[in-house]
Amino acid sequence: MTKPVWIRHASQLATLAGGSSSPVVGAKMNELSIIEDGSIWLEDGVIQRVGTDEDLALHYRDRTHEAQIIDASGKLVTPGLIDPHTHLVHAGSRQNEFNMRLNGATYMEIMNNGGGIHSTTAATRAATHEELFAQSKQRLDQFLLHGVTTVEAKSGYGLTLEDELKQLEVAKQLNEAHPIDIVSTFMGAHAVPREYKENPDAFVDMVIEEMIPEVARRKLAVFNDVFCERGVFTPEQSRRILEAGVRHGLLPKIHADEIEPYEGAELAASVGAVSADHLLRASDKGIEQMAEAGVIAVLLPGTAFFLMAESANGRKMIDRGVAVAISTDCNPGSSPTVSLPLIMNLGCLKMGMTPAEVLTAATINAAHAIRCAHEVGSLEVGKKADVTIFDVPDFMTLQYRYGINHVNTVIKNGTIVVAEGRLA
C-alpha cells in the first residue's frame, strides 16, 4: 500500500482554488489563492487536506509516522502543470526546415512545397506502432521532467483512416502505460494530403463520413479539431467538420487565425467550441464573440517565437473577458519543445501576461480547455494528487529566472515520479 505523502513548509503553496466550476477570467486570473508555509496531505491518489503547516500538523498529529514527508521549505508548490495543445504522437524531425525559415522561407511556403505537415505525415505513416510509441514516450518523459502531469494529444499526421487510428491508438496505449494523463483529440483535418490536393472537398467528405464515425465508435478521442486557415481548410469546410464531430459526440476545437485573419475565432464562437487555439491574427470582433460564447483561448507563444512571428495578444484577450490557457504546441515543425515553464515565460514577455496569469493559464484554465478541471488544475480536496514543486521561493521568481528547469519534484496520483529533478 502506498504511503501518504505530506508536503510541508512550502514557501508558497499556490492552490488555484475556486476555479473548478468555470474558466477563470479577467482580474481573477491574478488570484492564485496562495498559502504561505503551506502544507498538503496526499493519500489514495487524491488530495486529502490543504492548509498551513500548523493546521495539518495538528490534524494529522497521530499519523505523522505513516507519511512520506517532503520538506518544501524555500520552494513553490503548484498543481501539476497541464499542456492543453500538443502534437505528441509523431515520427521524424524537421530541423532542415529551421534553416530554410532562417533564410526567408515562410511556414506556408514550406508546407505548399511538400514540407511542413506533409513531411511529418510521411514519416508518421511509415513508422510502426512500436516506433511511434517509443518516440512519443521519450517526449512524455521530458514533459514530466518539466512539471507537466496532464497533456492533450492530437492526431493529424496520418491523414488516412488507418494512420489516424494508429496515432490515436498509440496515445491510448501511452495513457495506460505512462504516469502522465493523456486526453486525445482527433485532428484528421490537420492538412489536405497531397493525394487530395486537386479535390480538397473529397477529403473533407472522407473525414466526415469515414474518419469521424470510426474514431467515435472506438472511443479514441474526446475532441475534434480542424486547421482553419487559408490554403488549408476554409471556414465553411471547417464548420462542416466540427458539426460532424458534434453529431458523433466529439467536442469541437479549432486551430484559428494563426497565419492571417480568417474568421476562425468567429467560427469557434458560432459552433460553441471548447477552445480556439493560436489566434495570432484574431479580429477584435472574433475576440469579443469568443468572450460572449465562453470559448477558451489556448495561446501558443512558443510557436510564434519559433516562427519569428508576432505573438497573440493575450493581454487584450484577458482584458476583454476571454479565458486564456497556455500551451507548448509541442510539434516537430513550429514548436519542438516540451518546456511549458519556458512557454509561460514567453507568455509574460511576448503576450503581456503577468506571472500569476500564466500560472493560471497553465493549470486551472488549461484543465478547462480539455474538460478535466473537475479532476486536476488546482490543489483542492478530492482532486487528483498531481503536484509540482519548483526550486524557487515564489511564483514571480519562476518567471524571472527564465531558461532554467526549476522542477524539483513531480507527484502524479499521489506517487512521486520525479525527485530531485530526475525520473523516479
Curated annotation (Swiss-Prot):
Its cofactor is Zn(2+); Fe(3+). One of its GO terms (cellular component) is cytoplasm. Pfam families: Amidohydro_1. GO terms for biological process: L-histidine catabolic process to glutamate and formamide; L-histidine catabolic process to glutamate and formate. It is found in: Cytoplasm. The gene is hutI. Belongs to the metallo-dependent hydrolases superfamily. HutI family. Catalyzes the hydrolytic cleavage of the carbon-nitrogen bond in imidazolone-5-propanoate to yield N-formimidoyl-L-glutamate. It is the third step in the universal histidine degradation pathway. This is Imidazolonepropionase. Binds 1 zinc or iron ion per subunit. 4-imidazolone-5-propanoate binds at R94, Y157, H190, E258, S334. HAMAP family: HutI (MF_00372). Its main location: cytoplasm. N-formimidoyl-L-glutamate binds at Y157, N331, G333. GO terms for molecular function: imidazolonepropionase activity; iron ion binding; zinc ion binding. Pathway: Amino-acid degradation; L-histidine degradation into L-glutamate; N-formimidoyl-L-glutamate from L-histidine: step 3/3.
